[in-house]
Amino acid sequence: MKNIEKSEIIISLVDVDKEFGDKKVLDQINLDIKRGDFVTLLGPSGSGKTTILRLIGGFEWTTRGEIKFNGIDIKDVPAHKRDTATIFQDYALFPHLSVRGNIEFGLKLKRIKKKAEEIPDVVWKKFEHLKKKWQDKQKRKIKELKILQAHLEKLLENPQLDIKKRKKLQDKLDDSDFRYSNWENYLTSKSESFKKKYLTRKITKQEINKEITDIIDLVGLTGNENRAISELSGGMKQRVALARSLVIEPEIVLLDEPLSALDTKIRQKMQVFLKKIQQKLGLTFIFVTHDQDEALQLSDKIAIIRNGKIAQYDEPKQIYDYPVNKWVANFIGDSNFFQAKYIKKNQVEILGLKLYTIHDEFIPGQKLDCLIRPEDIDIDLNSGYFKGKVIQNIYKGSYYSLDIKVENTIINVETNDFYDLETQVFLKWDDDAIHLMEMENAEI
């Protein structure tokens, strides 16, 4: 897949469903990933984030929908033909090979473009002749499939169809969609096979040695080339797995919770290292994790996955500051939630007090969820919006986490200052600290 014309959007998932038997694990997934971005799929266990990664990598097939690589649907393309490399949670290193042996493994299959002067004119003429035949066949097959799909879609519009008949027709339509994807890739696949045979050569031993030396230096493994995998720490194994993936020069690196087995300090170092490598090489990284802090620190964009759907897809700061709903807000960080009532433009009522808000998009009288992050609340001993007392004080290393009781409401506050239990305090915040969200099934 290396010779497809490049576009800004490198991967696009369009209306992707995935079913395992009668269970739907992904439901209408739509996701565009830009070339060179570090994108994290974040969600709780069982949300579907790893399934999305496996679909992109070709380890699972979609039930329906499209997975586009540079604009072409590749859902029927097997994993080994996709321009991706995958780093698994357990690294999947070969225990019988050394560090060098693991990295070298993929290189042995790599081929190098021949110089133009090394290719006879007759080869180019043959390629152009075959390319025309492939194009004609591709157009004919795609036209046939479009006619078939239109016919099946027309039949499915009949409301009188019983469940069994409808499922049979839907299965035929899904199958035709896979065949359509196959023929959409036909010209590219045939062209690449021809180029591999006639326009490339095997990589030489000297070239292999240079590439291994370069990648080992890049990932910081110099001096460890001949060590056995069993002798390495978790962090070093991770570097070997990364080197093995990068040395084959993929366009996309898929990472399935690769840091989850590491202890905290090594994990933090590897987070910095991964981001540095990704930025240096300009590759697209798609990273799966359930760790919110990890996602916020590493990502250019985060897709929050919940129950097989994308709850929100945006830049980390936008998701943290402007979550689309209460669930996302609670999942992505510590939160204080209040029931709020929108009074009028730029005015909201919280805990019986009317306050200024930067929000102006809601309807007067509308009931809303209100989010205020603990770190956005200030403590004052003399004045503020609400008066309360400290009922819990927990030292977190770089700050104190306080629970403040305001009438019947507990408000969590993060502060650098220590306050004794039972201390009377006032709480206040900046206008933009209030984030209002629509309530599910809210009444006006």
UniProtKB/Swiss-Prot annotation:
Tell me which residues bind ATP: 43-50
Q: Which domain of life is it from?
A: Bacteria
| Keyword Cell membrane assigned | yes
For region Insert, the annotated ranges are 111-201
What one GO molecular function would you report for this record? Answer: ATP binding
For this protein, the record's Gene3D superfamilies field holds: 2.40.50.100, P-loop containing nucleotide triphosphate hydrolases
Mind naming one GO cellular-component term on file for this protein?
Answer: ATP-binding cassette (ABC) transporter complex
Question: In what way does this protein cross or attach to the membrane?
Answer: Peripheral membrane protein
Cell location: Cell membrane
Sorted alphabetically, the keyword list is: ATP-binding, Cell membrane, Membrane, Nucleotide-binding, Translocase, Transport
Please give the Pfam families that the UniProt record associates with this protein: ABC_tran, TOBE_2
- The top EC class, named as a word, is translocase
- Subunit note: The complex is composed of two ATP-binding proteins (PotA), two transmembrane proteins (PotB and PotC) and a solute-binding protein (PotD).
Q: What exactly does this protein do?
A: Part of the ABC transporter complex PotABCD involved in spermidine/putrescine import. Responsible for energy coupling to the transport system.
The name on file for this protein is Spermidine/putrescine import ATP-binding protein PotA
